[in-house]
């Protein structure tokens, strides 16, 4: 009986212990995601896409508040409407990840800013902080844009991590008038439950593998000097009322629809939630291109009307 009890205890305690160790070692990688290089081939492909819709690209460099150099592009529409859209890519990606979205906007007369997020692509920055520093980066980008272009309107569009940054950036800077956010995370801690649950069930991340989440977040806070509770698009949309179009990919296992639903419930401003049947993580444009185009352009044309 004692032997059986020891076996049972080992079976019960080993997975949480292993999860805690894994979380401890995963934290540095979480803050230092693999960079997707901005290769000459990718730049040529992007340029071809811009030329196809009449866009004109130029380099755009911004100095962040902590001194990091953020690199990206301004892309001007052939028939500009004096509104600019900041396009934010996802984790482990770079500005190329939102080129297809930019094509839609450029055709409609929107000028677009595509920046590599800190610690991504060609931008500097010691760590990715998922909105803690990036919201200030967004403000620096807007400062530089306003100084050079005097835009009539500024909007934002983001994918995954970029969606979270766009929402947090808009909450902190009222010059960003409205946000389209596809596959956003509700909070850093809530996203860690999905990560710890192996993209199978967040319940695993909250129970059996909870030590992974605890150690990942705790060590991340220690290494980066941020408070995880302060990295929350869900809280951000409750701080300032601004229009949001939330896009949820129905088959998303990385950041399931509950994240967008929580943000929708918390949002104080005009809001709309579009659930895209069959779409995987950040693939709404690929699954329903015409509807994506219609909804995004309609939203930016009259953000406050989106209820």
Model-identified regions with their sequence ranges:
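Hydrolase active-site cap/lid region
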Residues: 169-226, 235-236
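The serine-hydrolase catalytic nucleophile loop
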Residues: 91-104, 117
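Conserved alpha/beta-hydrolase
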Residues: 104-124
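Conserved alpha/beta-hydrolase "acid-adjacent" motif
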Residues: 253-259
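An N-terminal hydrophobic leader/cap segment in hydrolases
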Residues: 4-8, 13-63
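Short beta-strand/loop motif that positions the catalytic acidic residue
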Residues: 239-241, 246-248, 252
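Alpha/beta-hydrolase active-site loop
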Residues: 97, 128-149
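Catalytic active-site module of serine/aspartate enzymes centered on a nucleophile-bearing elbow/loop
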Residues: 287-307
């Amino acid at each position: 009986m004692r032997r059986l009890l020891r076996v049972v205890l080992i079976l019960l305690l080993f997975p949480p212990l292993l999860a805690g160790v894994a979380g401890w070692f995963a934290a540095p990688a979480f803050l230092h995601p693999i960079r997707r290089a901005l290769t000459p081939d990718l730049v040529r492909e992007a340029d071809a896409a811009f030329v196809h819709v009449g866009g004109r690209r130029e380099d755009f460099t911004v100095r962040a508040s902590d001194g990091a150099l953020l690199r990206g592009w301004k892309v001007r529409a052939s028939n500009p409407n004096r509104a600019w859209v900041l396009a934010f890519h996802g984790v482990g990606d770079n500005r190329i990840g939102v080129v297809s979205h930019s094509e839609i906007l450029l055709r409609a007369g929107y000028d677009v800013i595509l920046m590599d997020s800190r610690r991504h692509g060609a931008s500097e920055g010691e760590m990715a902080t998922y909105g803690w520093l990036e919201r200030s980066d967004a403000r620096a980008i807007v400062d530089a844009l306003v100084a050079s272009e005097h835009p009539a309107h500024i909007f934002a569009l983001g994918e995954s991590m970029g969606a979270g940054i766009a929402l947090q950036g808009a909450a902190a800077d009222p010059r960003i008038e409205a946000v389209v956010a596809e596959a956003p995370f509700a909070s850093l801690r809530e996203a860690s439950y999905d990560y710890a649950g192996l993209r199978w069930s967040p319940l695993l991340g909250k129970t059996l593998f909870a030590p992974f989440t605890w150690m990942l977040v705790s060590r991340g806070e220690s290494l980066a000097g941020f408070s995880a509770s302060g990295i929350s698009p869900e809280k951000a949309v409750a701080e300032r009322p601004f229009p949001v179009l939330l896009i949820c990919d129905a088959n998303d296992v990385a950041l399931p629809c509950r994240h967008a639903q929580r943000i929708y419930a918390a949002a104080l401003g005009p809001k709309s939630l579009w659930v895209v049947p069959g779409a995987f993580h950040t693939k709404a444009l690929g699954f329903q291109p015409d509807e994506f185009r219609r909804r995004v352009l309609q939203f930016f044309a009259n953000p406050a009307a989106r209820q």
